């Protein structure tokens, strides 16, 4: 179906889609006057990458701060933290200790801590590292200009780790495209409270952005040349975006499937991805979107965590291994060749060898293409942190190595099977491996390197895969006029 322009969206409809308000065409804004330098160190997930980009946008617009990759020349240095992995707090304080020297000689450098560790630790960060000027959570990054001004005027450290729901999205500047692919956050937080996870405590309960607000951001990015949209959320397929007169009591709600259908009609958007999902929220509506929307990438990341029902219950995941496989079967009925990746936690408290073998059986049955897998890391304040854990670390590491080796071997076989096929690739830029070549990603998230004209950057091209490498593919453009 032909693309829908921004101005046409007031009348565009998807299957069961609401009538939408006219969306503004993005116009280039005047560049801010540069009044200083900003350095941001980002740890963790894609949500943090998105948040860091928004911090940069906010401070460029309000304070005239320009990004630098050298903290020593920065006027403001920020670390955007992640609390998922073990010893996250200690890593943050180690980073801060290295930055303390930036204030030597009385240089008025602002040092700030954001992200999930900031939410967890709050005032404790300033007590332990009194040279820290700002502590702010994921929901208050939009208040950075006010926090910086308050710090400079009062001379006191500022801490704001509140949860003002979706307010931050209302106070962010217009998005700026940094390439042909862009992330768009559509919701915040998680309400699942898995026993091992800190996210509900650091990012709050699930809150969805209004439906039309998301479409406005996507349309603005498309007008700037973005061709691939990555929809983000801690539990992205729980999205319920309000739309209607005032998005109030009488509002209706769009789920992720409807959002995808509608985004697919925006002119210029040629590919849609989303992450991260929860199996409990993997609805028939989403399966139908995979069936009906060709722009929806032939790839799904769906964290299962374990294959043992006993361990899944202890994790409070809310589904069984059989129920997970049932969802995959439904999806493969409409997308038989879809690539599926997942998350695994090995060595969860009480995991026996039999439990682990059930995880390996699930991996064999599903045929995962990629995985993000780790040994269980105890997170203070979570229910699982109180569980007895008597499995030796050497056993856990051996299990993890076996799991990763199995999935890596299967992924290699998939890559090899792609040799001789034609893959649709979004050209992202010059290859890091060889600047004379171009690089992009296939639908199943494999880097593809190939010779080509730099003018193709930002376009989709059909690439004939000629070789499978350990972590990438090589190929050549199938036709000279294949860009579209």
Curated annotation (Swiss-Prot):
UniProt-annotated location(s): Cytoplasm
Start and end residues of each MTTase N-terminal domain: 36-153
InterPro entries according to UniProt: Elp3/MiaA/NifB-like_rSAM, Methylthiotransferase, Methylthiotransferase_CS, Methylthiotransferase_N, Methylthiotransferase_N_sf, MiaB_methiolase, rSAM, rSAM_horseshoe
Annotated [4Fe-4S] cluster 1 binding sites: 45, 82, 116
EC number of the protein: 2.8.4.3
Record: residues binding [4Fe-4S] cluster 2: 190, 194, 197
Required cofactor names: [4Fe-4S] cluster
Coiled-coil regions, chain positions: none
Residue span(s) of domain TRAM: 416-479
GO molecular function: 4 iron, 4 sulfur cluster binding; metal ion binding; N6-isopentenyladenosine methylthiotransferase activity
GO cellular component: cytosol
Keywords in alphabetical order: 4Fe-4S, Cytoplasm, Iron, Iron-sulfur, Metal-binding, S-adenosyl-L-methionine, Transferase, tRNA processing
Region (Disordered): 428-450
Assembly and binders: Monomer.
Function: Catalyzes the methylthiolation of N6-(dimethylallyl)adenosine (i(6)A), leading to the formation of 2-methylthio-N6-(dimethylallyl)adenosine (ms(2)i(6)A) at position 37 in tRNAs that read codons beginning with uridine.
Family note: Belongs to the methylthiotransferase family. MiaB subfamily.
Name of protein: tRNA-2-methylthio-N(6)-dimethylallyladenosine synthase
Source organism per UniProt: Xanthomonas oryzae pv. oryzae (strain MAFF 311018)
């Amino acid at each position: 179906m032909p693309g829908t322009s921004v101005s046409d969206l007031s009348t565009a409809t998807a299957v069961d889609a609401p009538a939408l308000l006219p969306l503004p065409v993005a116009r280039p804004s005047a560049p801010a006057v540069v009044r200083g330098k900003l350095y941001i160190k980002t740890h963790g997930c894609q949500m943090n990458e998105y948040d860091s980009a928004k911090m940069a946008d906010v401070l460029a617009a309000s304070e005239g701060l320009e990004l630098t990759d050298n903290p020593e020349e920065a006027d403001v240095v920020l670390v955007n933290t992640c609390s998922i992995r073990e010893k996250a707090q200690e890593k943050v304080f180690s980073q801060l200790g290295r930055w303390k020297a930036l204030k030597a000689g009385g240089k008025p450098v602002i040092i700030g801590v954001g992200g999930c560790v900031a939410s967890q630790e709050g005032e404790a960060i300033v007590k332990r590292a009194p040279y820290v000027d700002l502590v702010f959570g994921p929901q208050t990054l939009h208040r950075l200009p006010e926090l910086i001004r308050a710090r400079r005027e009062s001379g006191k450290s500022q801490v704001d780790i509140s949860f003002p729901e979706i307010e931050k999205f209302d106070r962010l500047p217009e998005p700026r495209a940094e390439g042909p692919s862009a992330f768009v956050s559509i919701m915040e937080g998680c309400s699942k409270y898995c026993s091992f996870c800190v996210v509900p405590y650091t990012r709050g309960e699930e809150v969805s952005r209004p439906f039309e607000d998301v479409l406005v951001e996507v349309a603005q990015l498309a007008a700037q040349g973005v061709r691939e949209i990555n929809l983000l959320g801690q539990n992205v397929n729980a999205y319920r975006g309000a739309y209607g007169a005032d998005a109030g009591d009488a509002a209706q709600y769009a789920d992720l499937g409807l959002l995808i259908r509608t985004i697919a009609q925006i002119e210029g958007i040629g590919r849609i991805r989303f992450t991260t999902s929860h199996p409990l929220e993997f609805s028939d509506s989403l399966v139908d979107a995979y069936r009906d929307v060709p722009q929806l990438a032939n790839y799904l990341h769906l964290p299962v965590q374990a294959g043992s029902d006993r361990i899944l219950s202890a994790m409070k995941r809310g589904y069984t291994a059989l129920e997970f496989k049932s969802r995959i079967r439904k999806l493969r009925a409409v997308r038989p060749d879809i690539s599926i990746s997942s998350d695994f936690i090995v060595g969860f408290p009480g995991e026996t060898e039999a439990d682990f073998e059930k995880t390996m059986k699930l991996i064999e049955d599903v045929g995962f293409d990629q995985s993000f897998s780790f040994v269980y890391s105890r997170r203070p304040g979570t229910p699982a942190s109180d569980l007895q854990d008597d499995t030796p670390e050497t056993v856990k590491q051996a299990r993890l190595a076996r799991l990763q080796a199995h999935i890596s071997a299967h992924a290699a076989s998939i890559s090899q099977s792609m040799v001789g096929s034609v893959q649709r690739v979004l050209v992202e830029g010059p290859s890091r491996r060889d600047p004379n070549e171009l690089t992009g990603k296939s639908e199943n998230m494999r880097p593809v390197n190939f010779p080509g004209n730099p003018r193709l950057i930002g376009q989709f091209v059909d690439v004939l895969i000629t070789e499978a490498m350990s972590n990438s593919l090589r190929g050549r453009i199938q036709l000279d006029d294949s860009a579209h």
